[in-house]
Amino acid sequence: MAWVSTQASLPEHRNIERTAGTEQTHVPVWKRRQTRHLWPVMEKREVPEPTADGLGAPEDEGQNVAIELQNPSALNPPLTDGGLVPNLKWSFALSNNLKDKGGYIREQLESDLPPSTDFAGAQNHLTKGSIRQMHWHSCSEWGYVTNGTVTISMVDNDGRNQVANATAGDIWYFPKGQPHVIQGVEDSNEYLLVFDAGDFANEGLTFNVDDWLTHTPAEVILKNFGLDNRSTAFDHVPPNFGSINTGKVADESVDSPFGQLTGNASWYFPASKMEFTQAPGGGGSYKRVDSTNFPVSQKIVGQIVRVKPRGMREMHWHPNGVEWLYFQSGTARATVWLGAGNARTFDFTDGDTAVFPDNSGHYIENTSDTDDLFYLEIFNSDVVEDVSLIQWLALTPPDLVSQVLNVSVDVVKALSKEKQVILAAKP
C-alpha cells in the first residue's frame, strides 16, 4: 500500500498552469469540491494513491479521498485478488433516509446490493415515546437493539401475547405474519432489523394497521368491532400515521387471557445478559443465538462477534447458505473467494453491511491496532453452521494434505484439530 502525505507530497505532484504570464498552482481535486468542512481533516491525513507493488500511478482527477481512505483494498487490491466478484458491500450512510416525526429508517435492499437476494436490513431510530406503528410482514423479522431501550409488544395467532423491554444487545424474532408494535423508551433508541426477503420494499411485505382501516368502509369497521352504526369511535384514524410517529411511553399493563409467549415460545431473547463464549483461538469471543437457545428463531439466526485488535475470524465457510453481515463498530477487511480463481477483498467500518454468497470461503480481520471489532453474522437457517479450514485439514490424513498443498507433513500434524473461530494476533 502506498500512502502519500498531503502536506509533504502534494506539492511534488502539483500541476502548474500558466495564464497570461503568471503561474497558478494546481489545486488538488479534493479541494476543488464543495467540501470545505472536510479540508482540515484532509490536510492532516494521508492521501491514498493507487500505487503498490510497482504497479499503478498517482491519481490526477476523479479522486474521492474520503471513500478511498475507507476502502484501501479497493484502491490497491491484494495481488491475490482475481477474477470477477460483484460488489458485496453497502453502507447505511448511502441509504435514503426515510424520516418521520419521532425517528427515521434507513434500509439496505436488494436494489442497493443486488447479491443480497435473501436478506434486507434496516436501521431504525426512535425518540422517546415514538412508535413504529402496529404492523406485520409477509416475511420473518429479526431485531437487534444497538442503543437505548424499546418496548416490543406482540400477539400470535392463538391470542398469546408478550410485552418486553429490549435493551442494547437484546434480540427479537417475529415470525412471518405475526403482528407487533415497537416504542422508544429512552431519549434515543436504535435497533437493526433483518428480513429474509431482499425485495423488502415491494408491496405486500409490510402491512400497517392504519392503512388498512382507512381503506375499509366505515360501516364495516363498526360492524367488525361491534359498535353502534352511529358511533364515531374510528372517525379519526390518521390516514397517514407513517411508519413512525411521536407518542407517550405506554405504562398500562395488558391481560393475557390466552396465555403469554414465554419460555420456548418467547419471541424475545435477552442476549445482553448472555455471556460471550471465548474463542479457542484466543482472538475474541462471540454469542451464538439460534434455535438451540432461542427456539422460535427458525428462519433467521446469528452470531454477535467481538474480535480483538489485529485478531481474525478464521478462514471458513458456511454450508447452510448465504451470510449477511452488519458491522457495528471498528474496522475490518475480508477477502471473499467464490472458487475458480474469483476473489475480492473488501474493507468495512461502522454501519456497513455485506453479503457473502452461499458456501463462499472468507475470513474477517480486525485491522485496528487498538480497538475491538464488533459485527453480526446472520443466516437464513435455524442454526449457525460453519466449516473451519484449519479443522478440515487437521482431521484429514496428513500425507494427503501434504501432497495436495505441497506442505510438510509436520506442518499439517501441528494444526489444531479444534475450530479456532477467532485467531489472536501474533506478537
Which residues make up each language-model segment?
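Histidine-centered metal-chelating micro-motifs
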Residues: 130-133, 151, 170-172, 176-181, ...
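Ligand-binding loop in jelly-roll beta-barrel domains
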Residues: 167-168, 176-208, 322, 349-350, ...
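A short, N-terminal "cap"/entry segment at the start of jelly-roll beta-barrel domains
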Residues: 11-14, 18, 25-122, 223-308, ...
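Intrinsically disordered, low-complexity regions enriched in proline, serine, glycine
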Residues: 134-136, 154-155, 162-163, 193, ...
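Short, conserved catalytic/metal-binding micro-motifs enriched in Asp/Glu and His
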Residues: 4-8, 20
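A contiguous, mid-protein "functional segment" used to position or interact
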Residues: 190-235, 371-415
